[in-house]
Curated annotation (Swiss-Prot):
Subcellular location: Cytoplasm
Annotated keywords: Cytoplasm, Stress response
Function as written in the Swiss-Prot or TrEMBL entry: Inhibits the supercoiling activity of DNA gyrase. Acts by inhibiting DNA gyrase at an early step, prior to (or at the step of) binding of DNA by the gyrase. It protects cells against toxins that target DNA gyrase, by inhibiting activity of these toxins and reducing the formation of lethal double-strand breaks in the cell.
Organism: Pantoea sp. (strain At-9b)
Similarity comment: Belongs to the DNA gyrase inhibitor family.
Name of the protein: DNA gyrase inhibitor
Encoding gene per record: sbmC
Amino acid sequence: MKTSIVERPAQHWVGYRLQGPWQETVPQGFAQLKDWVARHALQGEWMAIYYGNPQVVPPQELSVETVLTVPADFALAVGEGIQHGTLAGGHYFHTCTEVQNNDFFSAWNAFFAQLQQRSDWQVDDRPCYEHYLSDGSQSGNWLLNMYIPVRPV
């Protein structure tokens, strides 16, 4: 797995925040977002922003934002039922990987193991996120960028 430290800009987004087990909330959130995006003919980067450590937080307390990036000046119409937010920029530990058979858990575990081998960076309190480069919703196979927020030790 090839990894690097990258500097990412802040990214504005529209999307849905859901709470509960990620294997349920991520597909649900993207289904909602896909419908909303189709009605508004928007284009952007599809991402999932994760809140909570699944090794210590019970599944029902995990949160995810399923989002599409938008320009900074994007304005939502009142009553749309969708949220608008900003993903913080800064340093991130990055990899581009292929997930097979929807096994995101193994991909994240391997990615975190790579970061733990480094002594010069540590995880900070911003959320981890995925940027999808392909739609694997039918096949279960995904190409994506994964990002872990970091700060120097």
